[in-house]
């Protein structure tokens, strides 16, 4: 059993035991980060809400990226959307309403992924797709984008596995079925069959 000690001066907790499990240490660190952020809040009627100025700035960057997309300035659009995503991830306080942050991040990441795929930046798109799946956005269109990206990177085995995972969730999805057939054809051609 781990004994926790609270330091009234620093407002942080520490484990007093010499041997502490890594998961316990991680939890303590997360509590301390959140506590430090909350203590800095000076509003006595505090309820966790997103910072309106920051939200407006993020929204403005994203919208300027979408305007650039409409004007066919794809690289500039990708730059603005990427900056909006980075701000949403790094500049928000840890206590801000996560229920607002996650859908916002999903929406912006999808747009960034589409831009990366259009510009042929498949590796960058693949990283963002993995991040999307890691945050729990398990939808057929995410698997379609990932499988398509893997096909363009000639990662046929992984593309097949991605299609199969997507079809396990949505067996009737025609795009995933078509990608699975294309993947099987590419694998057979690669193996000389």
Curated annotation (Swiss-Prot):
One of its GO terms (molecular function) is protein transmembrane transporter activity. It is found in: Cytoplasm. GO terms for biological process: post-translational protein targeting to membrane, translocation. InterPro entries: TPR-like_helical_dom_sf, TPR_rpt. GO terms for cellular component: endoplasmic reticulum; rough endoplasmic reticulum membrane; Sec62/Sec63 complex; translocon complex. Keywords: Cytoplasm, Protein transport, Transport. The keyword Cytoplasm applies. Its main location: cytoplasm. Present with 5290 molecules/cell in log phase SD medium. Acts as a non-essential component of the Sec62/63 complex which is involved in SRP-independent post-translational translocation across the endoplasmic reticulum (ER) and functions together with the Sec61 complex and KAR2 in a channel-forming translocon complex. A cycle of assembly and disassembly of Sec62/63 complex from SEC61 may govern the activity of the translocon. Component of the heterotetrameric Sec62/63complex composed of SEC62, SEC63, SEC71 and SEC72. The Sec62/63 complex associates with the Sec61 complex to form the Sec complex. May interact with protein YLR301W. Part of a complex consisting of KAR2, SEC63, SEC66 and SEC72. This is Translocation protein SEC72. It comes from Saccharomyces cerevisiae (strain ATCC 204508 / S288c). The lineage of its organism: Eukaryota, Fungi, Dikarya, Ascomycota, Saccharomycotina.
């Amino acid at each position: 059993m781990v004994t926790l000690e609270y330091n009234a001066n620093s407002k942080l907790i520490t484990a007093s035991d010499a041997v502490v499990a890594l998961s316990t240490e991680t939890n303590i660190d997360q509590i301390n980060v959140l506590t430090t952020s909350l203590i800095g809040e000076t509003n006595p009627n505090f309820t966790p809400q997103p910072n309106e100025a920051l939200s407006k700035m993020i929204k403005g960057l994203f919208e300027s990226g979408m305007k650039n997309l409409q004007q066919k300035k794809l690289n500039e659009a990708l730059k603005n959307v990427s900056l909006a995503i980075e701000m949403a991830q790094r500049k928000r306080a840890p206590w801000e309403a996560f229920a607002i942050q996650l859908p916002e991040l999903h929406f912006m990441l999808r747009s960034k992924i589409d831009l990366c795929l259009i510009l042929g930046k498949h590796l960058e798109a693949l990283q963002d797709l993995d991040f999307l799946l890691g945050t729990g956005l398990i939808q057929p269109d995410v698997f379609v984008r990932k499988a398509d990206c893997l096909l363009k990177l000639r990662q046929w085995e992984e593309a097949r596995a991605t299609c199969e995972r997507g079809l396990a969730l949505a067996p009737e999805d025609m795009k995933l079925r078509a990608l699975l057939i294309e993947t099987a054809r590419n694998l057979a051609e690669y193996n000389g069959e």
